[in-house]
Amino acid sequence: AGVVKARNEVFVTQDLTEKTHYISSTGIGGRHADPKVTVQMDTYAVDGLKSEQIHYLYAPTHLNPTYEYGVSFERGTYVDYGDRRQVFISGTASINNKGEVVCPGDIRKQTERMWENVEALLKEAGCTFDDLGQMIVYLRDVADYTVVKGMYDERFPDTPRVFVYAPVCRPGWLIEMECMGVKSLENKEFAPY
């Protein structure tokens, strides 16, 4: 809750609101191997983009806007270049378009619903799971690792991924994933990446 509150407060100071858009992101607490490290963050930024290169993803048939339940991030974003489309899917869980947890207590069904939600976001970007270059999967309970890893091995045998033991945002969520991908395309309006 502290990370969510702090992120919301900082974003307002930077004019990041539901009216101006947020960033695609995943904010999950964890623990660094060094107990002196209290915060760590990875970022990706590109200078010189035109606003028409950036597109936000919603998948309203599956997901609701995040600000409706008090958090501030975009569900996903894609950026078009002259030679490719990059897609960034924020941490996505087993949720419906009313903001409710779907399939509480069932790791298999939550994983399937989460994939359905991610697929809806990718489809909106004109992409599929085949366009993904990497996935990060967050598990609330390490006991679910064997089941979930088996599901991923079967469905995504060639996609690089890492599993992280971390407290997923809501207590009812057992799993969450974020991912990034690239799709080849030709767009003469923009410079190549």
Residue map of PLM features:
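N-terminal presequence-like segments and the immediate start of the first folded domain
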Residues: 1-134, 138-193
